[in-house]
């Protein structure tokens, strides 16, 4: 299951539970807060999993993976080497070293914002 589908599913589930169980006006804002937190956590957790699934691992680029195909295409396009700062080089660096604290903060913020927008309509 993709991260966006997982986030959407979690948001919908939280919203439905709140609608069924809520008799008070306080529960709905708490559910929205929970939805926003879930969105941020899912966004932070999904990126490393997606990078690994694509083949950008701590040990390097996995053979016969999407990452290997991307690297091959980038090398052919650049005459034999992958350009520093290119998408492939950046993703390889993220896969090898992991995400920085700032990157996690930004991803969490974006995931929370998306979840807040989704929760607003449910």
UniProtKB/Swiss-Prot annotation:
Residue ranges of the region described as Mediates interaction with SKP2 and hepatitis C virus non-structural protein NS5A: 76-122
GO terms classed as biological process: apoptotic process; defense response to virus; extrinsic apoptotic signaling pathway; innate immune response; intrinsic apoptotic signaling pathway; modulation by host of viral genome replication; negative regulation of transcription by RNA polymerase II; proteasome-mediated ubiquitin-dependent protein catabolic process
UniProt crosslink position (Glycyl lysine isopeptide (Lys-Gly) (interchain with G-Cter in ubiquitin)): 69
PTM comment text: Ubiquitinated by TRIM21 via 'Lys-6'-linked ubiquitin chains leading to IFI27 mitochondrial migration.
Induction per the UniProt record: Up-regulated by type-I and type-II interferons.
Membrane topology: Multi-pass membrane protein
Presequence boundaries: 1-33
Effect of residue 96 to D: Increased pro-apoptotic activity
GO molecular function: identical protein binding; lamin binding; molecular adaptor activity; RNA polymerase II-specific DNA-binding transcription factor binding
Regions crossing the membrane: 34-57, 71-91, 99-119
InterPro entries for the chain: IFI6/IFI27-like, IFI6/IFI27-like_sf
Alphabetic keyword roster: Antiviral defense, Apoptosis, Endoplasmic reticulum, Host-virus interaction, Immunity, Innate immunity, Isopeptide bond, Membrane, Mitochondrion, Nucleus, Transcription, Transcription regulation, Transit peptide, Transmembrane, Transmembrane helix, Ubl conjugation
Mutagenesis or variant effect for residue 56 to D: Increased pro-apoptotic activity
Localization of this protein: Mitochondrion membrane; Nucleus inner membrane; Endoplasmic reticulum membrane
Pfam families: Ifi-6-16 (PF06140)
Sequence segments annotated as region (Required for hepatitis C virus non-structural protein NS5A degradation): 103-112
Protein family membership: Belongs to the IFI6/IFI27 family.
Subunit organization: Homodimer. Interacts with hepatitis C virus/HCV non-structural protein NS5A; promotes the ubiquitin-mediated proteasomal degradation of NS5A. Interacts with SKP2; promotes the ubiquitin-mediated proteasomal degradation of NS5A. Interacts with NR4A1. May interact with BCL2.
Name recorded for this polypeptide: Interferon alpha-inducible protein 27, mitochondrial
